[in-house]
Structures are given as structure tokens and as C-alpha cells.
Amino acid sequence: MKKILAFLLIAAGSTLFFVFLFIFLSKVFSGEILLSRYIFRIGGFELRWYSTLILMGFLISYFVARKRAKNEGINLEEFDELIFYGVIAGIVGARLYYVLFNLKYYRSLWDALKIWEGGLAIHGAVIGALLTGFLYVRLKKPSFTFLQATDLFTSVLPLGQAIGRWGNFFNYEAFGVPTNLPWKMFVPEPYRPVVYKDYSFFHPTFLYESIWDLLVFFMLSVYFKRYRKRHGEVTCLYFVLYSLGRIVIERLRVDSLMIGNIKAAQLLSAVLILLGFTGFLILRSSQEPKRAF
């Protein structure tokens, strides 16, 4: 009886939440409600939605990953230490990647350090975290392998990404080209690119990626628990699945980081798909024991 009651309460709460979210989004997307970047501002102190949602995404992902690490028999003190270093490297990598592609917009080092205002790139974060994880495992010799750690990391990363993308929503960024589709999103003129200043409605690409990230999280979670044979397989699948969605969605975005005439995210995603697919085939065909990886 208690289980049934708990299920009904969760179902009712979830239904109310999604109804509220639908109504709220419909009003924002139509332009009836204009968003603020700030949760509140008191004097010189301000709390932004962007940084809050990034932090929320990290914390939820961290606790899910920690539970999985415990089930894997991993020393949790070592795991927490790796996460600490990985987060620092991830933030530095995410910001550095973004700033390097937008140097002309940063007049000083202080401007480049204002990560709470937005401007983090997931590819830079992943590169920074993976490099740090590799060095940590090589130097500290913990109770887990590098690929075991990356599997834990990438199995929950899409969940954090799905939540963090809503920070772009409140910043009116990471949207796509103009559209007249029923789910079009109103963007105030100050946030529109100059070439699209006469358009009012755009593709909500932040929402597309958030939904895709959530789907990737569920797919990787199922694979992690039921089908994984070798450490590293989940990491390879993350590279493939996330990158497939990113390549498609990036085609619509108007604020992409560029390498010449090529969108950097699409180029790097194509490389990750190739590496991930190749790595997955090698790992699945290997006869070595799981621990070797």
C-alpha cells in the first residue's frame, strides 16, 4: 500500500511539474514572459540562473556517479579526490576552449575569468577532465583504471549537460536560426545576432540538446548496468551518441565557435564519432579481462 501511495504521489507531482513547465515555456516562447538572467540581485551580490543550473547539474550527476562507484567497489575517497581535480580541470578547459575562439570579445584577463556570465564549452570541459583523470590514475595508482573512471564520468555527464543547458535558456543564448515552427522561441532584440535582428522567433536548440542529452543518459545507464563487457565501452558510446546529436543540432545554431568556415563543434564531434566507434569495436572484440582496461 505504501509503495502504491508513493508511486501515486510521485506520478501526481511529476504531472503537475510538467504541466507547469509546459505553460511556462509556452509563455516564454511566445514572448509573453521575458526572462531574467538573475535569480536575485542584492547590492553588489548577484545569483545567476546559468551558474546555479550548472552547479545543480554537476551535483546531481556527482551523486549518481558516486553511487555507481560504490557499487563497483571503488574507494570513494579516491573517487572524490579525482572528481575534485577533474572539476577544476573541466572548468578551466571549458572556459579556455571558449575564450580561445572568442578572444576579440575579451578586453582583459578579468573578463575572461567571468565564467558565471556564461561562455563554457563542453568539449573543452571533457578534454580537461580526461587529461586530468589520465594523469591522476598514472601518478596515484588508485583502486580503479582510467577507463573505469571515464565510464563512470561519461555515464552521468549527459544528465548534467541536460540540466546545465537550461542556463542557456535564461541567458537567451545557444538558440538556432529563425523559424515559424509551433515550438518557436521568442528572443528579445538585444540578444539577436545582427544578421537576424529583424526576426523574432528562433529554434530553441538548447531544448533540443537538453532532450537529446537526457535520452543519451538513459541509454548509457542501461548499457552501463546490463551490457558492458569492458571498461571504456560506455566512454566510446558517449562519444558516438552525444556527438551524433551535437552534429545535427549544431547545424541550426547561430552562435557556433568557428574554425575558418567550419563549426568547431561539428568537426570535433566527427572526430569523436570516429574514435568512439573504432574504440568500441576494439573493446567489444577484445579477449582480455575487464580489469586490463
From Swiss-Prot:
The protein's superkingdom reads: Bacteria
**Where is this chain's protein located in or outside the cell?**
Cell inner membrane
Keyword Disulfide bond applies: no
What are the alphabetically sorted keywords of the record? Cell inner membrane, Cell membrane, Membrane, Transferase, Transmembrane, Transmembrane helix
- Provide the Gene Ontology terms for cellular component: plasma membrane
Q: Where does a 1,2-diacyl-sn-glycero-3-phospho-(1'-sn-glycerol) bind?
A: R165
According to its record, how does it sit in the membrane?
A: Multi-pass membrane protein
Name the predominant localization: membrane
Cell membrane listed as a keyword: yes
Listed GO MF terms: phosphatidylglycerol-prolipoprotein diacylglyceryl transferase activity
Bilayer-crossing residues are 45-65, 81-101, 115-135, 144-164, 204-224, 231-249, 262-282
Q: Which Pfam families match?
A: LGT
This enzyme's EC code(s): 2.5.1.145
Q: In which pathway does it act?
A: Protein modification; lipoprotein biosynthesis (diacylglyceryl transfer)
Q: GO biological process annotations for this chain's record?
A: lipoprotein biosynthetic process
The entry's function note states: Catalyzes the transfer of the diacylglyceryl group from phosphatidylglycerol to the sulfhydryl group of the N-terminal cysteine of a prolipoprotein, the first step in the formation of mature lipoproteins.
Instruction: Say which family it is in.
Output: Belongs to the Lgt family.
Q: What is this protein's record name?
A: Phosphatidylglycerol--prolipoprotein diacylglyceryl transferase
The record lists the organism as: Thermotoga maritima (strain ATCC 43589 / DSM 3109 / JCM 10099 / NBRC 100826 / MSB8)
User: Which gene is annotated as encoding this protein in its UniProt record?
Assistant: lgt
